[in-house]
Amino acid sequence: MKMIIKNEWETPDAIPAKDIDLEHFSEEVELLIPEMDAFGVIREVKRIGYYHLQAHQWFVFSEDNTREELCSRVLAWRYLS
């Protein structure tokens, strides 16, 4: 059975598909998360991340893509196109 992946935003309650090569990780996805700027204004930003299936937590990659950070609030996610 072939899985059909749509490029639509999903709620954080829906979990992305498991990565084929990594046992406890989902596929990398685009996340929509709230972020506060230097002036205290909260805005929605898009970041690349994944869901850890064993820890039941979202993680995002830092903006320079050198490290992973725990993400406590995810507004939505979608598969990378």
Per-range role (PLM):
Residues 70-81:
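Short, structured beta-strand segments at or near domain termini in extracellular proteins/domains
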Residues 26-28, 74:
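Exposed beta-strand and adjacent loop surfaces of beta-rich binding modules
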Residues 29-63, 67-68:
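Acidic, low-complexity, intrinsically disordered interaction modules
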